[in-house]
């Protein structure tokens, strides 16, 4: 539909909230917007790998729903830190305290709660591709090296290994040790992977599923306070990254926790609603770019950058 315009899609991290990406993809496809390249972080790398593998949003939805409802997925252990934001009885509150004590006890003796082998098995269930070369469209996956603090970008080689590293939540999933690196979740350094797409396409659509500070309840214990400290940094970093995108879609996910995989349908619907609300503006912007004479496109791009820097 947009011949000559290479469209990139940046899929942010956020655990179960990654299902929002599926809803957005469905709406984009329905309106003739088919990404030429995808970049994914953490949950976004999972959904990105599925989309790059099947290149069909409805197929991604079907496979994803099948897997998150399977016994194999439940065995990943997310139930240990699930955090309901709904009204709780006194018994639920007591149970939450027990869970928090459990996490603290385990973390004092180990670097993680679950082995990354479980993430590998989950990835292998979600899509058939094993190597980046098996994919139908290009995919970029980001992980984080906790030794250097750098983002590690993957475009080739083992797809499964890249996804495992990108999805290894620090302190929860076992890190990968490779080439003097300690590799964990890409969300640590690149909450929404916009920058890896900068030289790969003409127009970047970012899907932001990171919870803003206004979306979160006041922390009530040590675990939640520690988590909140990191969240502040992530929100500010993510804001910087999103400014590099040409268009941003932000699904509203009603304060649902990153481990709420039992709410997958709601996340998909949230993605659809956000995309439908934004689609007219997106289509208009794409049409304007396509109809802009090539000799002024670069000038238009820099004009937009200047507005962001000095407005």
Q: Which sequence ranges carry the predicted segments?
A:
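Patatin-like phospholipase
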Residues: 1-41, 49-311
């Amino acid at each position: 539909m947009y011949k000559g315009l290479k469209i990139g899609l940046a899929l942010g991290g956020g655990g179960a909230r990654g299902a929002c990406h599926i809803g957005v993809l469905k709406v984009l496809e329905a309106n003739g917007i088919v990404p030429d390249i995808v970049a994914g972080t953490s949950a976004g790398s999972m959904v990105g790998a599925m989309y790059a593998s099947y290149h069909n949003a409805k197929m991604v939805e079907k496979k994803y729903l099948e897997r998150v409802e399977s016994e194999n997925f439940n065995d990943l252990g997310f139930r240990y830190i699930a955090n309901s934001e709904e009204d709780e009885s006194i018994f639920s509150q007591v149970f939450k305290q027990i869970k928090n004590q459990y996490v603290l006890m385990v973390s004092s003796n180990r670097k993680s709660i679950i082995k990354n082998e479980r993430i590998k098995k989950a990835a292998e269930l979600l899509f058939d591709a094993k190597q980046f070369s098996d994919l139908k469209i290009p995919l970029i996956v980001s992980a984080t090296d906790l030794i250097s603090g750098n983002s590690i970008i993957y475009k080739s080689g083992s797809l499964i290994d890249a996804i495992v590293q990108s999805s290894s939540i620090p302190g929860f999933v076992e890190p990968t040790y490779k080439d003097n690196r300690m590799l964990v979740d890409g969300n640590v350094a690149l909450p929404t992977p916009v920058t890896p797409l900068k030289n790969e396409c003409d127009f970047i659509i970012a899907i932001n599923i990171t919870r803003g500070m206004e979306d979160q309840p006041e922390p009530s214990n040590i675990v939640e306070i520690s988590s909140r400290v990191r969240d502040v940094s992530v929100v500010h970093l993510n804001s910087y990254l999103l400014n590099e995108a040409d268009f941003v879609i932000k699904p509203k996910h009603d304060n649902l926790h990153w481990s709420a995989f039992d709410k997958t349908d709601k996340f998909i619907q949230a993605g659809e609603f956000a995309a439908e609300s934004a689609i007219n503006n997106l289509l208009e912007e794409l049409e304007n770019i396509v109809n802009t004479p090539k000799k002024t496109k670069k000038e238009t791009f820099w004009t937009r950058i200047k507005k962001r820097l000095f407005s």
